[in-house]
Amino acid sequence: MLCRTILGECHAHRFGGVLADFEGGAREDRLPFLSRLGAMLTQSGRRLYVPERFAVPEASVLICTALSGGTLRERLSDAAARYGTQRVALDCQRLAMDFVLPCRSGEGTPLTPEELSARRERCGAAVFFSEELCANYFSYTAQGRAHFVLFDTAETLRCKLRLGRERGMETAFLMYPEVSDLLPELLNA
């Protein structure tokens, strides 16, 4: 019933697909639902997009581009090998994180655009570009601890989109609340 309702909404509003952006881990009940929904959407000429933890054969898989380790090129190549290039879509999450070093978990403290700006001004640190991560970074020391800050700009997001396109990945998602302040730069590129 729910799948038919979703399909009806897609038809009524001429949506080309559905993004199933669930929070949390992959629960048992969601995978059969997503398989059924994906099959129905495919039959109607539409696509289903799911986060990687919910990957089902009937859906395109969202690959997060906000990395703190490895390389984005490798990540996209691995995803293409695993799912097929045509099933990979980019989830261009805007990265802004402060990592206290050493950081074995790969998880930092998320920063709002205002916090990032204030931290950059306070530190006066030089900003560099990481080709491996397609992100900007700077480092600073506070209270005797080394910090490494990774962050995205319109330019780094365009770099991630370009890298995906070069690999045949034509679909990407940018969430409006994360990039609303960057839209003029993103759209006028």
Region spans (language model):
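Conserved, mostly hydrophobic/aromatic
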Residues: 20, 88-90, 164
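Substrate-binding surface in catalytic domains of secreted glycosidases
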Residues: 27-120
